Amino acid sequence: MTTEDTENKNVIFIVLDSLRKDKLSVYDDEVDFTSNIQQFAENSRVYANVTAQAPWTLPSHASIFTGQYPWDHEATHKNTHLDTKRELLAEKFQSEGYETYAITPNAWISKPMGTTKGFEYTENFLGLASYDPVQNIFESLRTRFDSIDRQTRRKIAGFLDGVFNKIGSSDICKSRETVDEVKNTLQKIDEDENFFLFTNLMTAHEPYEVGEPPREYL
């Protein structure tokens, strides 16, 4: 075994929230608009059979961060936060001497949701990273939301999605700001520092409005 094999590797974990497998040329030859992702995949390990553990953000990320199924970590519609007593992926990296970073505009990846434990640096562009008054409001709303029956919760969630869509996806996705912050963070990290950086990009989660150039970054 060489020295290179035993050295710690830096890890960048990128989630393209809600991006469908059948919209990537890596998995479908008829797709012709994801050339950059295709190029990246050609020099990478690609898994052909991967299944998400849940159909929405919180339980899916809770499974990623805990290595558990939703019925084990219990962060679901019934209990809309992750128990902070559980050891999360970022904490494991911390214990190995890694600096840990979470950069995302996703409200489910935030301190009030219990999903950022172990990340020393958190930026989520929604004021939810470390602002205690907002956290208190979020926890209060979450407690009330959890007490409502499932059908009513779905109606509320659908209404809020409609409100966000009226506002405009560009206002809430903040993908450009997220990518810029990731780049700035990487530039600031000392080259001798081992790091784990997690980012979640939300553009595919919202209706896509074609811009100019429409496919520059795909």
Sequence positions of predicted segments:
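Catalytic domains that recognize anionic headgroups
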Residues: 1-218
